[in-house]
Amino acid sequence: MSRRRHIFISHHHADDAHVSRLTQMLGRNSYEIRNSSIRAKPANQRRIDEGRISDQTLKRLLRMKMAWASTVVVLVGKNTHNRPWVDWEINKANQLGKRIVGVFERGGTDNDVPDAFKDYGDALVSWNSNNIIDAIEGRCDPFENPDGTPRQPDSNFPHTNCGGR
């Protein structure tokens, strides 16, 4: 039986392929993701890059899409930490009281974790479907290195590991 969750996937637009891989991987585990994040088509991305869509318009759209989601998943990959929109989305998720789960993309490193996630993240997991599902569901709040080994959270908030992981 498939489980369906409404989430917002915060990511750098260059990582759109990882968004598809994440939803496909979880789908193979009967976990259906309804992603409300923005995935800019080339024409829309060009309008954004040219400044034809204001930051206020983007923020309003992101707030509406994020409000619909129960959890915000942050894809942590190369250069994620340099993306101001990812930090904005994490801060907004915190203001909205959303659960914030970081997922290391394959090849992601500790240096790629955004500063806002270090302050507000609830869980940080490797690219492993069971760990990702447990973190989204809130069954546990693990903090893992990119290779899946345990690590200390960056914040002082209390966190619980999953079943001894």
Q: Would you name each region that the model predicts?
A:
Residues 2-7, 21, 52-56, 107-165:
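C-terminal interaction surface of TIR/SEFIR-family domains
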Residues 29, 96, 118-121:
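Short, structured coil segments at secondary-structure junctions
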